[in-house]
Curated annotation (Swiss-Prot):
It comes from Synechococcus sp. (strain CC9605). PROSITE patterns: RIBOSOMAL_S15. Residues 1-25 are annotated as: Disordered. GO terms for molecular function: rRNA binding; structural constituent of ribosome. SMART domains: Ribosomal_S15. GO terms for cellular component: cytosolic small ribosomal subunit. The lineage of its organism: Bacteria, Bacillati, Cyanobacteriota, Cyanophyceae, Synechococcales. This is Small ribosomal subunit protein uS15.
Length: 89
């Protein structure tokens, strides 16, 4: 369920804040969201894969913590990231 190098680079290019940005909260949330989406599709087909389900819940928790950090630092960055990724209504 991991991302290969080209997919990571595409996510970084679309969500980076400046030219050399590879680890900002926006990029991390985008990568986690992509991994969460892939793992969710996997779990729809493999219902009894409980270890992957546990990993999914950990990723969701990590993304939630990153989003709350972004919200505390900059409401505008948070809103832009949510809108770009389409993860909350």
């Amino acid at each position: 369920m991991s991302l290969d190098t080209t997919e990571k680079q595409q996510l970084i290019n679309t969500h980076q804040t400046h030219g050399t940005d590879t680890g900002s909260a926006e990029v991390q949330v985008a990568m986690l969201s992509e991994r969460i989406n892939r793992l969710s599709r996997h779990l729809q087909n493999n219902i009894h894969d409980f270890s992957s389900r546990q990993g999914l819940l950990k990723m969701i928790g990590r993304r939630k913590r990153l989003l709350s950090y972004m919200r505390s630092k900059s409401e505008q960055r948070y809103a832009d990231t949510i809108a770009k990724l389409g993860i909350r209504g």
